[in-house]
Structure formats: structure tokens, C-alpha cells
Amino acid sequence: MLPLFLVLSYLGQVIAAGKDVETPLLQITVPEKIDTNIQDAKEAETQVTYVVRIEGKAYTLQLEKQSFLHPLFGTYLRDKLGTLQPYFSLVKTHCFYQGHAAEIPVSTVTLSTCSGLRGLLQLENITYGIEPLESSATFEHILYEIKNNKIDYSPLKENFANSEQESQSYRILVKPEKGSNSTLTKRILRIKIIMDKAMFDHMGSEVGVATQKVVHIFGLINTMFSQLKMTVMLNSLEIWSEQDKIETNGDADEVLQRFLLWKSKEISQKAQDITYLLLYKDHPDYVGATYHGMACNPNFTAGIALHPKTLAVEGFAIVLSQLLGINLGLAYDDVYNCFCPGSTCIMNPSAIRSQGIKVFSSCSVDEFKQLASQPELDCLRNTSETEFVVQPQGGSYCGNHLLEVPEQCDCGPPETCTHKKCCNPKDCTLIDAAQCGTGPCCDKRTCTIAERGRLCRKSKDQCDFPEFCNGETEGCAPDTKAADLEPCNNETAYCFGGVCRDPDRQCTDLFGKYAKGPNYVCAQEVNLQNDKFGNCHGRCNYSAIFCGKAVCYWNFAEVIQTEKYDVQYTYLGGQVCVSAHLRSQTGTRDDTYVHDGTVCGSGQVCFRGDCLRVHVLRGTRECEADDKCQGHGICNNLNNCQCESGFAPPECDMTPSSPGGSMDDGFWLPFDKSTPLIFKRHGLKYKKVLLISFYILLPFLVVLAFMAVKRMIGKRLAKQNISKALEHKEEAFNRGSMNPGVVSGGNTDQNLMTVPGSFNSYAYHGNTDQNFMTVPGSFNSYSYHGNTDQNFMTVPGSFNSYSYQDVPYYRSIPEDGNDSQQ
């Protein structure tokens, strides 16, 4: 069973706190904006400073702009029929800031500056909320203290297959020498939020207000995750404004399973997007549930978070932050072994009921550095295609490679425009008669959308599939790869993260062509040492010997030349084993450890330093290859079949003409199974088409003219020679000479002619209305099965052999993406 975390709140022990825990001690303050000396208007917009007086003391708030909303962020309403309707929200995406009070270095400020200041000021051990006084003409704001200390509950329940081992692993991870020298790099966690009807009603039943509150919560979350250089990007908000789509009552794990099942079946939910359902309950028994370390596993990218009646906005932001931390693989803090700069750190179970600054502890930071170097969090590195660009107020952003309303195209900034003949990079408009100006499926020379079937993204691995243009849009089809733990390499290995995890291949990539995977004795000797050259992210169990450091055979007399790793050589049983240690912990993936998904036993693979059963990690899937793909394909990461050559999607039906593929690769379009497959050639240039057509048509016209002349001559010759042929028939048989043989079965209306001097053999089976002619000097053999209305002619001196048996059309795709016909 995968590790499932339930964040429980035993609110039966809660001291009654009334309707709201925000006990306001109201103050009136007038924030003063300080002009900066920055001349650049754009740069000045990204940094602002305000002075706010709290209890008579002035605090200087130094703020920088936050960018955590997707450029195409939107709010959607789902009605009773399940239809998703866009709501055109007036939420402004350019006025969210975070920073600190200059007078208190250990402080955090998260504000929206549109129409006044709204947000939180977390000053050491006290938190203030600030909002504009709507009726004030002098920019007055109300300031109030926020308290959560009325809440008293134990927030954590764990469901691990081996809780003792997990605890031990955590203690090892928080040792200061582990990852202390590594540097974090920018990462993005993309998330979609769904709000149930009770939560919507609690927030006022007004879409604009609910949207603003959710955005405000994610402003707080991003302030906390900025310490890890992590942006939690809010992609969209969906509101169940009329009726819930699942039953939200019951135990935490039951609700989570129902939500995960609904998400997997809902076409609008992308499998790779992590999605959270926000629920409201007056007195729940828990405040959240999610899967541990599954942020990049599309089968488990879901969670639920409950907003109790007595929890403030700040506390709910901490609940979500803890759940997201669990998604990333973090554990709750051991307060006796972790250093916390403030009074309470984010992954401390008691953080939900405390006020003031919230940061990640030394344990969480070191643990995240370790996790970030592992392949299970590779999806967080994808920051290029949808990297957030702050949009100017009132419009889209021209030059960010994103096609937004009202842009006609977007080829990037002028100096690096990718489609200079098609798109004007200054105003993002199409040039002249251009049909497109953005994306890999827009031809840069003709400015037209490429035809269906053109290769636009090559395969990188046998577990990564090629994508093609679909002939309708200028963008390439979404990147598809094999679902995790699908078989590869002739079923000797498994796919994981779009790569076939073969131990021999990892050894070759790590040490060179003379390295290969180890046996048990070699791996045991090295990995049980529990040093920097041999460990399993901690001490190895005997069952996980193959899941620690990559220990390889070295079959070469020279030492390994590398500047990236320290290499250890172990002589054992007449053979040399090598393992490595990454010298510089830079936040990149540490490939000296065995990759997740690598085989470690029969039906077992490595996962986070342990050897687990494949069926346990796979769980229940929407796509099972043996059933859905009929044994002639594997499942991709979108739960569709990737079919073998000779079998056609979506269900891998036998189709000899099919090159294989899936319904997601861009080439295949939805079709009726009764409709024959017709493929078109792509990629031929206009001049080449004319030239090829000329060379094809010219011989055809010559042959056609020659046929007409020869047919006339043939008829005359036939009349002259037919009587002679009959006269000599008996004489020829008596001489034992070779004669034309005609075998015909069930044929009607046949016109056959042979000419003296030729050797002809014909076989017709069920053919009707046939017309054949041979001319002198030719050796001809024809065989037709089930064909009707055929007309053939051979020319003198030719050797001809035809056989037609309803052979299907065949299509192949070369590397350059152009089709070839055979």
C-alpha cells in the first residue's frame, strides 16, 4: 500500500472558539507608499515599498512581485449536468507581492496591492491582517491581530508499510552532512484547485470573492515555498457551485480514493496536474489527506484539504503547505533533531495553530535537497514551456511564446523570433497571408500549418514516443511516454519517467562502455558499508541491496576518467566492482544511485532506496495493457494504448498497414473502425511535387499511346495467325514443344491473346471481364485472385510477373518526418 498521509484534527477536544478565530483588535493605519529611485518603470513595478504603522511604530515593508498564477489562469463553474463553464473573473494577476519588514529581518509579508493593501504581516510570533477601509477617502486601512491558538489537535496519522524503517530513513536524511553543500535550483509545482459547494458557500457564494481568497491563500503558500526556490503555480480554479461531483462524507482515505477515481475519469483533468479538492466541514476529524512523495506520479497526483470552521486563512495555508510538502516527499519535523529559525516551522505538527513567521526547518531543507536530486521529482524541472511571465495590466504579454488573446501569433522577442517571415514580434500579428506564426507545426518558410503526420518531436528512448503534427494546429502534440512500470527491453526491464531503467545501461552511462550491472555479491559488499560509496539513502536492508548505489562491474585495465565523481574500486572474487560519489551537490539528480524503476528481483523494482513489488506500486490503473491494448501495445502516461507496428489505436486492433502509435501522438485522429485507413505523404515541396509528377506521367502517357497502337496491330496479327495456330496445334503436341497454358476457373467474358514466339502462362481465379494482351518476345506470368475488370499489357522484350492478393497499403515514417510508400 502506498504511503497515505491523513492529517487528522481531533476537534472534539477543541475549546469552543465561536464562529471565527480571527479575534480582531482593530487599529486604523494609513499605509504610505515610498517612491524608489529606480528609473526603469518595469523594474520599479516589480519592487515597491510601503510604511505601515502598527501600535504607533512604523514598519517599512520591502516587497517584490510574486509570479504564481498561470498566464492562462481562469475560474470555471461546473453545473448540475457536469458541464464546465468558464467564468470571466476580474482577478488581477499583476499585483501580488511578498517581502519582509526591514525592522524585523525574520518576518514575512504577503500582500495584494490592487485597490489597497490586503494580506498578512507575519512579524516574528504575531500575525496581522490588513484590509482597506472601503468607505475611506484617505487610504485608511484596518489592521487586526490573527490568532489560531484556540485550536488543539494532533495533526498526523501515518500509514506506512514499514513505519520503523521510514522513521530511520528520516533521521539519516536530517544529518547535517547530508546535502548541506547542495544548492537549490528553480522549480515549479503546478496545481489545480477544485472547491466543493460547502466551501463555496462558506466563502460567500460569490465567484469573484472565492477566487480572490484562493489566490490570496496561494500567495501565502508561495511565500513559504520561496525558501526552497519553489513556485507553486496555480493553473486554474474549478468551483462546484451547484452540486458536488463526489460524496464528500466519510473517512479521509475513502474521500481521497473517490476523488482520485473521479479525477482519472474526468476528461478535463490532466493526469499530470496535481489536483486538490478543498472541502468545508464544521467539525471534521481530519484536515487533509494525500500521497507521500507522489508529486510527479500521474496516478496519484491528488489530495484533499478540509477547512474547519475554527481555522483562519493563515492556518489553512499552512495545512495546504504541509500537504504539498508531503506530496514532495517531506516528513514532519522531529523537534529534537531539527533546527528552526523561528518559533515553529512549517512541517511541525503544531504549526497550524501558531502565529508569526513560518519557514522550513533544517530537516526539511536538507531532505528536499536530497529529494530534488532524484528522478521522482523530475517533473518539477519543466520550467520552460509554461514558465510564468507577469502580464501587463489590461492585456496579454507579447513575446513570451504563448499564444494569448488577442494575439494572432507569438514567436518570442524580436531578437530570437522563431517565425520571422510569419509573425511580427513587436505586436504579435501575422504578416500578410500567413496562416500561423507560432509553434513547431507552423512551417517557417510557407507560414502554413504542417500536414498531419510530420514529425515534430523525436523519441528519446524506447519508453518515450514520437509526436506528430495533427494538421489542424501549429503546436506539437503533448509529449507522451510509457506509463511507469510498463515493460521494456524485451520485458527484462521497466519504464520509469519515460526511460527504460536497465542496470547495464545505467552503468554504461555512469562509467563508460566497459561497465555493466553487478551481481548480488558485489552489490552486497559495497552497499552494506553505509558510506558515501555504498548506501541506500541510509542503511541498506538485505532485500534492497540492488537499490542503493549503482555498483557496476569494470572490465577494463585503465581507471575511469571523470571530474564529476569520486570512484571507488572494489576487488572481489577476481572481478573489479566500481561505485561513485557525486563530488558537488548542486541540486541536480544524483545518478550514482540506482534509478527508481530498476529491477531488483522477480516482479520487484527499486523505489526510493527500497525494493518493492511492482503490483503494489502500480496499483489499480485505468489502462491495463493486456486488456485494453489486447497484448499488442503498452499504456502511455495518458492511460491510452501505444500500439505496436501492424496494430492500430485506440485498442490495438490488427491493421497490417498501421505504423503503430497512440491516439495522443498527433497523427491519429478519431475515426470509425469501419472506415479504411488512408495515409497521405507529407513534406514534399511544391517544385519537387511538380517534378516528380512530370517524371511519373510522361512514361505513363507513352505506354498508353503504345498500348493503343499495339492493340490495333495485335488484333490484325491475331486474325492472321489464329488459323495457322489451329492447323499446327496437333503437330506441335506431337513434337513435344512448349505451349501456352491457360488455367481459368469461373472466369467470364475473358479476352486473352498470345502472340507467336512468346511463352505465356495465365492463372485466373474468379476473375470477370478480363482483357489481357501480350506482344511478341515477352515472357509473361500473371496471377490474380479476386480482382475484377483488369486490363494489362506488356511491351516487347519484357519479363513480367504480377500477383495481386488484396495487399494493403503500407506506410513508413523516416527520421525526417516525411512518409514513404511501398
UniProtKB/Swiss-Prot annotation:
Signal peptide per UniProt: 1-16
Disulphide-bonded residues: 296-379, 338-363, 340-345, 456-476, 623-635, 629-641, 643-652
UniProt keyword Hydrolase, yes or no: no
Peptidase M12B domain boundaries: 187-384
Gene Ontology MF: a single term: metalloendopeptidase activity
Pfam families per UniProt: ADAM_CR, Disintegrin, EGF_2, Pep_M12B_propep, Reprolysin
PANTHER family to which the protein is assigned, alphabetical: A DISINTEGRIN AND METALLOPEPTIDASE DOMAIN 3, ADAM A DISINTEGRIN AND METALLOPROTEASE DOMAIN
Identification of the protein by name: A disintegrin and metallopeptidase domain 3
Organism of provenance: Mus musculus (Mouse)
